[in-house]
Amino acid sequence: MSNILQSVPVNQKVGIAFSGGLDTSAALHWMRQKGAIPYAYTANLGQPDETDYNAIPEKAKAYGAELARLIDCREQLVAEGIAALQSGAFHISTAGVTYFNTTPLGRAVTGTMLVAAMKEDNVDIWGDGSTFKGNDIERFYRYGLLMNPALRIYKPWLDDAFINELGGRKEMSEFLIKSGFDYKMSTEKAYSTDSNILGATHEAKDLEELSSGMQIVEPIMGVAFWRDDVEVKRETVTVRFEEGRPIALNGVVYTDLVELMLEANRIGGRHGLGMSDQIENRIIEAKSRGIYEAPGLALLFIAYERLITGIHNEDTIEQYRESGRRLGRLLYQGRWFDPQAIMLREAAQRWVARAITGEVTIELRRGNDYSILNTVSANLTYAPERLSMEKVEDAPFSPADRIGQLTMRNLDITDTRHKLAIYSSAGLLTGNSSVALPSFEKDKK
């Protein structure tokens, strides 16, 4: 049996994730006119482009909401962002520049906290502004049903009646004006933006064309570092971690992680740090393109990964990165709270993050251009004296030790040479290869 309603649930409470924008304003008022009883829930995610959160619930009431609530999600969102950082839950990157899954993290928090608030008000029908082509419709569906198994979904954008009457921005604006609201449609940008305290996503419209570069975007969390008229000064910043948690920036200790993230955003934003241009695979396997900002997470991630490479061994780092990519995909798919994701996340937090204590000093320049100036930690296993080219007292190993180690390598070298001779006899090492390979012969018995 489907949980999705395809027409307005008349005389029933309908919770709507209300942003105060044109889409949700028109949808809320239209639902009220059609006989639904809308309840509006607004998530305070620390969006950098939102100036007055308290005005949003009042706006919802004016459009016909029976009840309008503002839910502060910032603390939970930052906590989930730090958990993603600790576990390296980022699977999308281009040439080493990372997308920090900031929108999927926002959806995980919004989807769970708003539905929890709806349950308090005995609201078991939920709607939001996600379209059928995107990722969010599935993310919200999963998180909503995880929080409330009795939840039913009503999305105006899946209702033919709504689409036929108010299928575009022009129609929605005219509808509100005819209903007596002094609504002025904002100038439409060349792309759409979605943001929270962790980062911003710019996509769609002109950005769907790969010939439109990052230069058409006006950053909301940082500076347009690619412009010659934008001055960006070098800046040195020190980031301190304690058992995997960021606790200090430039010597200032933060007990409130929200305040720490805001300051990290300000520091990274002054340089345009963390901006990236990514082509990605949506949940439905169609490709999309986005321009992303995440100045604070990018700053923290540089320091965190520097400490990881200085503290952990190769096998641990490999496991952390492989598990992180897998976890990043689960997060992207709306499975952040699924058992397989919790298993990967908690393993990284316990066995990787717990050892990460120390300070990293970084020089920031333009965009993602930076240098690491110093790394300090009592947990470092980096010990230059072990490999020093100078003569040292009590060397950890001698030339004779290395001779013995190399002699042991003869075992697998012999096996490898034997296999290559088999492949050579079969003609597998000649022909199509553009590289001249040596001729191999089997060892004579």
Curated annotation (Swiss-Prot):
**What protein name is recorded for this chain?**
Argininosuccinate synthase
Tell me its family: Belongs to the argininosuccinate synthase family. Type 2 subfamily.
User: Known InterPro entries for this protein?
Assistant: Arg_succ_synth_type2_subfam (IPR023437), Arginosuc_syn_C (IPR048268), Arginosuc_syn_N (IPR048267), Arginosuc_synth (IPR001518), Arginosuc_synth_CS (IPR018223), Arginosuc_synth_type_1_subfam (IPR023434), AS_cat/multimer_dom_body (IPR024074), AS_multimer_C_tail (IPR024073)
The UniProt record gives the binding positions of L-aspartate as: 131, 135-136
Among the Pfam families in the record, one is Arginosuc_syn_C
- Quote the record's binding site residues for L-citrulline: 99, 135, 139, 192, 201, 203, 280
Where in or outside the cell it occurs: the entry states: Cytoplasm
Q: What are the record's GO terms for cellular component?
A: cytoplasm
User: Where do the coiled-coil regions begin and end?
Assistant: none
* EC number of the protein: 6.3.4.5
Q: In which pathway does it act?
A: Amino-acid biosynthesis; L-arginine biosynthesis; L-arginine from L-ornithine and carbamoyl phosphate: step 2/3
Q: Which organism is it from?
A: Herminiimonas arsenicoxydans
**Keyword field:** Amino-acid biosynthesis, Arginine biosynthesis, ATP-binding, Cytoplasm, Ligase, Nucleotide-binding
CDD domains linked to this entry: ASS
Subunit = Homotetramer.
Reaction(s) catalysed by this chain, per the record, are:
L-citrulline + L-aspartate + ATP = 2-(N(omega)-L-arginino)succinate + AMP + diphosphate + H(+)
Biological processes annotated in GO: argininosuccinate metabolic process; L-arginine biosynthetic process; urea cycle
Q: What is the lineage of its organism?
A: Bacteria, Pseudomonadati, Pseudomonadota, Betaproteobacteria, Burkholderiales
Residues bound to ATP: 17-25, 43, 129, 131, 136, 194
GO MF annotation list: argininosuccinate synthase activity; ATP binding; protein homodimerization activity
